[in-house]
């Protein structure tokens, strides 16, 4: 996948999907990410860990907490939500007042997008920075939650089961709301894709509306269990 014919500037991909859904595999196999700056929670967690090790005010409570354990991961997740540090990190990357109008970096947001208001808030911020709705694209990685739970238990960096379940539910709900235009305040109108069982479904192209009564929309709805 290479949105807008591989444009080198001004493109944004929201990679949507619950924890352990296979988003990293999707990037490796299906997305031409070489020209994108990737923003993901792991990078933010590493910054938080470094801050705690240096004794920076506000991160003392993370000292000695291992983010690679279920308990530690829950602590880091809650800290990210409480401080909104992930949003601030994204703003620092995107808000460069000295760049030219055609030099907005391509961005790949690799996160669950499972929280209410997450897609709306980030997309609105991007529009304020100068990005365009038709250049904000969606790639939803859909995986059965039981498969995600199994994957999570088999990898070295594990999360608590409730994080896996809730992130899967939240990501699915937000994607459905966006797809069927219930998320009216989100300025997102780029290419829409869904990845299921390592197959890519192209739902719509940039600038077009989703044909909610068409065959593709019905196929997606059946896959997601809403038809």
Q: What is each PLM-predicted segment?
A:
Residues 15:
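Hydrophobic anchor at the beta1->P-loop junction of P-loop NTPases
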Residues 22-23:
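Conserved glycine(s) of the Walker
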Residues 27-105, 117:
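Conserved substrate/cofactor phosphate-moiety recognition/catalytic segment
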Residues 110-119:
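Acidic, metal-coordinating catalytic cores used for nucleic-acid/nucleotide bond scission
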Residues 145-227:
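Conserved GTP-binding G-domain of TRAFAC-class P-loop NTPases and closely related GTPase folds
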Residues 18-19:
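The conserved Walker
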Residues 129-152:
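Conserved phosphate-donor/acceptor-positioning beta-strand/loop module used by diverse small-molecule
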